[in-house]
């Protein structure tokens, strides 16, 4: 029985996608830093944009985000991100206990525009955008082309409630025809920047 299990394990590992092995580790050009050393997080969401990723080596998705906050909650450093339920990334956020927020140099704005306007349901948008997945020691996706990566564990999630919104927020959802976003609060576990 042990030989059979070992043989099956070897067979299964040989059949895994090649990218799972080649992208399994973060490059050595990433350096761990403190969340307190992140420069001007408002610029990350507001001006530079960022990618939100969730999943693992077998299946992942990412999208561009422009809404988010850094802060403290329950004595822990946190990042809050917002995802419309219609987004494919939301399926990954619901299934996984971690997410990553990845910042990029300004020359990657075209890639961020692409992953923000195309769905991963219909093809490998990350490859088309020229983004190369790498994975943290916890198995969470980041991108080789990024220059900042924040790994978070989801500690709270909840959909916005229309009855609690002001008129401007309600008008946003009426105009865009989106369902109210889901807020994901993640405790910051690790932060890296490029050397």
Show which residues each predicted segment covers.
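Positively charged n-region of N-terminal signal peptides that target proteins for export
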Residues: 1-4
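Bacterial N-terminal signal peptides
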Residues: 7-15
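Sec/Tat signal peptide C-region and signal peptidase I cleavage site
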Residues: 16-20
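Basic, polyanion-binding surface patches
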Residues: 21-195
């Amino acid at each position: 029985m042990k030989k059979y299990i070992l043989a099956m394990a070897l067979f299964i590992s040989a059949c895994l996608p090649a990218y799972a092995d080649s992208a399994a580790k973060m490059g050595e050009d990433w350096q761990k830093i403190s969340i307190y050393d992140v420069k001007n997080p408002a610029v990350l969401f507001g001006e530079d944009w960022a990618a939100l990723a969730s999943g693992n080596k077998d299946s992942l998705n990412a999208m561009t985000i422009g809404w988010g906050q850094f802060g403290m909650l329950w004595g822990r450093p946190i990042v809050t991100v917002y995802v419309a339920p219609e987004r494919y990334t939301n399926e990954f956020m619901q299934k996984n206990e971690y997410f990553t927020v990845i910042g990029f140099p300004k020359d990657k704005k075209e890639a961020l525009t692409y992953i923000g306007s195309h769905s991963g349901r219909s093809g490998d948008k990350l490859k088309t955008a020229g983004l190369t997945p790498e994975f943290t020691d916890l198995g969470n996706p980041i991108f080789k082309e990024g220059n900042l990566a924040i790994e978070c564990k989801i500690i709270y999630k909840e959909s916005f409630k229309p009855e609690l919104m002001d008129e401007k927020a309600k008008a946003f959802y009426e105009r865009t025809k989106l369902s109210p976003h889901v807020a994901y609060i993640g405790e910051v576990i690790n932060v890296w920047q490029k050397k």
